[in-house]
Amino acid sequence: MNITSPLSAPSHQYPDALGRFGNYGGKYVPETLMPALTELEEAYYRYRAESSFQEELAGLLKDYVGRSSPLYFAERLSAHYARPDGTYPLIYLKREDLNHTGAHKINNALGQVLLAKRMGKKRIIAETGAGQHGVATATVCARFGLECIIYMGVQDMERQKLNVFRMNLLGARVQPVTAGTGTLKDATSEAIRDWVTNVETTHYILGSVAGPHPYPMMVRDFHRVIGQETRQQALKKWGGLPDILLACVGGGSNAMGLFYDFIDEPAVRLIGIEAAGESIVSGKHAATLTMGKPGVLHGAMSYLLQDKEGQVTEAHSISAGLDYPGVGPEHSYLKDAGRAEYYSVTDQEAITALQRLSQLEGIIPALETAHAFAYLETLCPQLKNGERIVINCSGRGDKDVQTVAKYLQMEI
């Protein structure tokens, strides 16, 4: 069940020629970056249409990443939500955690490094929060022999020591970012500064469906294989489509990868789950689509967490990968269009969900992913018997063991 043409044209034609998803997206960048973005856009359109690019990408996704990832029926987790009359919804996991490097991030990193190689770029930079995108980027750079610099906030480096070591082991240089809050927003800002300075030799592998055009489109397209496989696997397993797709949302790449091929299927609910952090009322959260307002960050118009003066505020989440005050512009568009729903869950709810999945299914999810599982507590009681939910199990939780132990006040 391998996808042989992961970048074929969809019927949902966004972004437009200006890189906009309705009112969102675009290119809000310094003039020095415009030629690089134009070069990247032209190269992407050119190479994605070439059969040799398609074949190389499909071959690596199969033999290097290990695709297709399974669609797994979580029997005990489903039964956990049984009602007194014995009825319950059916929960399936799209197992992106089983990919090489342990998350969905490798899909995009691999696609972009093939693009960079064809563009003649010898130096690769990236930002990372949870470290999974950094590890994926370091991995593909090792595979293709390219110089790799990863920008990572010092707070995230402390939370994700295991992934920092993995990146170093893979030959990347991890550049600590002390500015601001020392988290993903600041790492992204530093990576953009580097790119402005070294634009001739360097390709920036942005890790989410955020940033200026063409990144939201390009990253979505490289992750689209998730939804394409899900459709094929669902049709094979039960002869229909899922009733609900559920995914966590930080920048929003794993969710867009799952959602995109179902946007034109109105019977399929699309639900994204953000980080409510300590709580929404505390102000310490990363619930951008729930609580934010439109504004510009990192080159694109989208929903942002802002204060009354329009300044971007700090985000908070126990999960480094959701700790971001913005979101991809296509998610903002889907929210306003009413096509996707967005809710939030707290740190505590995510930790509890991580424990629940671990103990019921023997699968330890990433803290980011656990936010989606936490929403089952709210969602499942509302559903009819036999309704099918597909959750994007976007990453494994090895990287989060220390964070979880610290939160639970347990010694390792």
Curated annotation (Swiss-Prot):
Gene Ontology biological process: L-tryptophan biosynthetic process
Pathway where this protein functions: Amino-acid biosynthesis; L-tryptophan biosynthesis; L-tryptophan from chorismate: step 5/5
SUPFAM superfamilies: Tryptophan synthase beta subunit-like PLP-dependent enzymes (SSF53686)
Reaction catalysed by this enzyme: (1S,2R)-1-C-(indol-3-yl)glycerol 3-phosphate + L-serine = D-glyceraldehyde 3-phosphate + L-tryptophan + H2O
Any GO molecular function: tryptophan synthase activity
Keywords of this entry: Amino-acid biosynthesis, Aromatic amino acid biosynthesis, Lyase, Pyridoxal phosphate, Tryptophan biosynthesis
Domain of life (superkingdom): Bacteria
E.C. designation(s): 4.2.1.20
Matches recorded under Gene3D superfamilies: 3.40.50.1100
In-chain residues carrying the UniProt-annotated modification N6-(pyridoxal phosphate)lysine: 105
Keyword Lyase listed: yes
GO cellular component terms given for this protein: cytoplasm
Pfam families linked to this entry: PALP
Enzyme class: lyase
Cofactor(s) required for function per UniProt: pyridoxal 5'-phosphate
HAMAP family the record matches: Trp_synth_beta
Family: Belongs to the TrpB family.
Function text: The beta subunit is responsible for the synthesis of L-tryptophan from indole and L-serine.
UniProt subunit comment: Tetramer of two alpha and two beta chains.
Protein name (Swiss-Prot/TrEMBL): Tryptophan synthase beta chain
Source organism (scientific name): Synechocystis sp. (strain ATCC 27184 / PCC 6803 / Kazusa)
Name of the gene encoding the protein in the UniProt record: trpB
